Amino acid sequence: MLNPGYADEVKEWHKSHPDQEAHFFWDKKTAPPVFRVNDRLTFHRINDVKFLEYMQGCSGYVTTAGFESVCEAMYLGKPVMMIPTHVEQEINAADAVGAGAGIESTTFDVSRLVEYIPSHNADSGVFRAWVQSAEELFIRHLTTLV
């Protein structure tokens, strides 16, 4: 998920890496549903179904470290590069890095993610087990409060 303000940074990175196919989802309301910069760089307006389809097929995921999308990437075993923009995202990124989701960065230098991908441990089994136990954990925590 991309703040439209970062689009120029992504485009600049892509000029140096024109062979790298990249799809970004952004919340730019005035943009068309699909904005193709060239054959290898495309921006998509937010669409939850399309986002998950692309997430499932991607090699890696770049985000500002929003909780939900990082969890979706972890569930699918996708390596993540997180560029947090405020304190909540900084906390999410630190937690996700600690959980093995990927790496943290201060810029949209996607090359860092591309270099990281071969070393990423894509075993999402532990995370999936934790997700599956959520209902039980939630009920247990609620009942201990009563």
Labelled PLM ranges:
Residues M1-C58:
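Donor-nucleotide binding loops and adjacent catalytic segments primarily
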Residues L2, A65, P84, S105, ...:
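Small/polar loops that bind or transfer phosphate-bearing groups
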Residues K15-P18, M74, V97:
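Anion (oxyanion) recognition and catalysis
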Residues A22-F24, P79-H86, E104-S105:
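Short hydrophobic/aromatic-enriched beta-strand-loop microsegments
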Residues D27-T30, N47-V49, T85-Q89, F108-V110:
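Short, acidic/turn-prone active-site loops that include or flank metal/cofactor-
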Residues K50-N92:
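A donor-sugar binding/catalytic signature common to diverse glycosyltransferases
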Residues I91-A101:
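Active-site-proximal loop->helix
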Residues A101-V146:
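Leloir-type glycosyltransferase catalytic cores
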